Design a protein with these regions (language model features):
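Conserved active-site "lid/cap" helical segment
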Residues: 1-94, 102, 160-167, 189-197, ...
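Beta-strand segments within the central parallel beta-sheet cores of soluble alpha/beta enzyme folds
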Residues: 50-60, 85-91, 115-120, 170-176, ...
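Conserved catalytic cysteine-centered active-site region
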Residues: 62-118, 122-141, 145-152, 190-214, ...
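Short glycine/threonine-rich loop-to-helix capping motif typified by GTGT followed
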Residues: 63-73, 255-258, 291-314, 340, ...
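Extended C-terminal subregions enriched in glycine
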Residues: 260-267, 271-294, 303, 334-341
């Protein structure tokens, strides 16, 4: 089955990201406020109204702080809409891209012709208690000193360095390119340009992971609106079509007992998405890659087939800026714009839409026609990212 060109993004909305609430006495906003704000911006961008969403699709990314199963229903109440179809982006940071595929298929089925996909979080304003949930983390990781994602990614990063000779200089080129693009993006939270030496000198978090390797937690809300090709006519902005989509969860490369932690599900999901879209690597104008860590961006470039595994020369000679041969993270990514929990993945979708509309301003990729976007979620026990989604977006169907 193909969903190529069966749905398009017609509106985008993102609130500014902030860290209000991290200090006593600071003004705070709730997740509900960020949700309503992001929806209003997306509706305005599309030229639609609230009533256009009633009886239509609503997709909600599930923040890690809200384990309750009825969060999407609560979001519908918060927004004041009555969906005809409700989907949960429950794959962590992959949720925003997963919803692109799910809503495209649903729109193609004829059940709906418009969908709002939205997420928000306010980790610095809202604090939730709770113990460690049963599962691999409690049983197999924490007892041995692995405390959260920084520790896990440190092992992946160290393994790549050991196996392929990867250095901080190779990784730093990605960090510098992302920050350069952030310096051109008024919506970015971190905008001061950095050098590779700045990256190398940033403090250790979990050896060899450094501070400038890590995503920036933040408050904020993000949304996009999708529609059928017929419904896109006479709307405010040109439609950006979903040309291809692929997803893999619980991927395993090699024996289950010794899976290769340096390969992610984007290796398969990317191939499926690109084949559906009918594109090759040279056709893609830019990449918006899920960036909870710099090494994760590095791995995706390899796994998507832009270079061979361990090809250090590719990273030494490739310019990843908007002026180079393979622009990545053209808005700065989550590392520089901030990650409001799982809604952070929507940042990449929104930036891709801006680029394909030609709205990138100083950071516009010249002649951008096709972009590739990824979403990743869950760092499971025994292998790399557990949920991987890839979408190919284009200015034509």
């Amino acid at each position: 089955m193909s969903i190529r060109g069966k749905a398009a993004i017609v509106g985008i909305g993102e609130t500014p990201t902030d860290r209000l609430g991290s200090k006593p006495g600071e003004p705070r906003k709730s997740s509900a406020q960020y949700l309503a704000w992001a929806m209003r911006l997306a509706l305005e961008d599309a030229g639609l109204t609230l009533k256009d969403l009633n009886g239509q699709g609503l997709g909600v990314t599930i923040p890690t702080a809200y384990p309750q199963p009825f969060w999407p229903e609560e979001v519908a109440e918060i927004l004041g809409i009555t969906p005809g179809l409700l989907l949960a982006g429950s794959t962590g940071g992959a949720g925003a891209v997963s919803l692109l595929g799910q809503m495209s298929a649903t729109i193609n089925s004829g059940l709906i012709d418009v969908a709002l996909c939205i997420g928000a979080a306010a980790p610095f304003s809202e604090h939730f208690g709770g113990g460690i949930q049963p599962g691999d983390m409690r049983d197999f990781e924490i007892p041995f000193g692995t405390m959260g994602p920084n520790s896990k990614i440190a092992m992946v990063m160290r393994r790549h360095m050991h196996q392929y000779g990867t250095t901080l200089d190779h990784l730093g080129r990605i960090a510098v390119a992302g920050r350069y693009h952030a310096s051109l993006n008024p919506s970015a939270y971190l905008r001061k340009p950095i050098t590779i030496q700045d990256y190398k000198d940033s403090r250790l978090v979990a050896d060899p992971v450094r501070l400038l390797d890590c995503v920036l937690p933040a408050n904020g809300g993000k949304a996009y609106i999708m529609a059928s090709p017929e419904r896109t006519r006479n709307l405010r902005k040109p439609p950006i079509f979903v040309r291809g989509f692929g997803e893999r969860s619980n991927p395993s490369y090699g024996p289950r007992a010794a899976s290769d932690a340096l390969i992610m599900g984007v290796a398969d999901a990317g191939r499926v998405a690109m084949e559906m879209a009918g594109v090759k690597h040279g056709d893609i104008s830019f990449l918006e890659l899920y960036d909870d860590y710099i090494i994760v961006v590095y791995l995706q470039i390899e796994d998507l087939g832009f270079c061979a595994k361990g090809d250090l020369g590719f990273f030494e000679r490739t310019d990843f800026t908007i002026n180079g041969g393979l622009p990545i993270q053209t808005g700065g990514g989550m590392i520089n714009c901030g990650q409001p929990s799982t809604a952070g993945g929507t940042i990449h979708v929104i930036e891709a839409v801006r680029q394909l509309r030609g709205e990138g301003d100083q950071r516009q990729v010249a002649g951008a026609k096709i972009g590739l976007v990824t979403g990743l979620g869950v760092l499971p026990y025994g292998k790399n990212l557990g949920c991987c989604a890839v979408a190919v977006l284009a200015s034509d169907a």
